[in-house]
């Protein structure tokens, strides 16, 4: 086992496969103006991680909105991402951005998309203007209620060709993550326990794997099972202020 905790690797989960399938459908759309798609779900399911990894792999433009966004601010962020001169009035900046985006058909990803809906969705309307003219794909990432919020803006909602809801990770997803990311072998029972304790929250899974690795390293274990982690907290439930602990089933191992 190496000195570094947990391998740095991208795990292609069921949510990833649904997302990629939806992107392909939007790219092959019939109506050029219907070039937007929405990704939503509760926190911790890997929305930002999956889509940002896809963006890095495909050359898409990845932006993260914030509560201060205005149409001009959005254009400035887009210019910075493309390393384009962001000076001048909004009209000239819009034109400078439109040309390369249209020519290269770069998708635009906007994380924390709720913030684009302020002031009658003024910032998102500006992005929509670009998408309408460039005929490129725009991917919005938001929380569970964003779908209903966007419905209030017909000019935007009518352009959303696909909606992808991210769901809790499956047992197969967790098994893949444990096998690909951990530098120690885990028993099937332990991977099932991690799935149960995490409730399919991939963020929790990623927090638990290093704990398993530390126990394995401290106790020189080639393969870790449920009994090796009995009573050991793998994470912490901050809402209930209680540790998330492997079920008791035998002797405890030492924790580094």
Regions found by a protein language model. Give the residues of each.
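C-terminal alpha-helical "lid" subdomain
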Residues: 2-21, 44, 48-53, 172, ...
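Pre-Walker A (Motif I) flank of P-loop NTPase domains
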Residues: 30-37, 59
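A short helix-turn-beta junction within AAA+ P-loop NTPase domains corresponding to the substrate/partner-engaging
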Residues: 59-60, 151-168
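AAA+/P-loop NTPase substrate/partner-engagement loops
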Residues: 61-82
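Mid-core helix/loop region of P-loop NTP-binding domains shared across ATPases and GTPases
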Residues: 70, 76, 85-137, 149, ...
């Amino acid at each position: 086992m190496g000195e570094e905790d947990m391998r740095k690797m991208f795990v292609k989960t069921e949510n990833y496969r649904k997302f990629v399938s939806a992107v392909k459908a939007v790219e092959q759309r019939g109506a050029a103006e219907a070039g937007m798609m929405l990704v939503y779900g509760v926190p911790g399911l890997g929305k930002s991680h999956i889509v940002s990894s896809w963006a890095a792999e495909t050359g898409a433009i990845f932006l993260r909105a914030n509560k201060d966004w205005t149409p001009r601010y959005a254009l400035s962020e887009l210019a910075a991402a493309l390393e384009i001169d962001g000076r001048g009035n909004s009209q000239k900046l819009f034109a400078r951005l439109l040309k390369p985006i249209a020519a290269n058909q770069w998708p635009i990803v906007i994380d924390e998309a709720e913030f684009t809906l302020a002031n009658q969705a003024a910032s998102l309307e500006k992005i929509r203007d670009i998408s309408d003219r460039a005929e490129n794909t725009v991917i919005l990432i938001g929380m569970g209620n964003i779908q209903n919020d966007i419905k209030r803006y017909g000019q935007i909602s009518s352009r959303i060709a696909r909606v992808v809801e991210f769901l809790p990770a499956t047992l197969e997803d967790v098994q893949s993550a444990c096998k690909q990311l951990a530098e120690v072998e885990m028993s099937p029972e332990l991977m099932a326990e991690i799935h149960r304790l995490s409730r399919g929250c991939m963020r929790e899974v990623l927090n638990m794997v290093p704990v398993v690795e530390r126990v394995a390293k401290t106790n020189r274990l080639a393969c870790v099972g449920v009994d090796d982690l009995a009573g050991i907290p793998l994470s912490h439930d901050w809402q209930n202020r209680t540790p998330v602990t492997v079920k008791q089933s035998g002797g405890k191992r030492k924790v580094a």
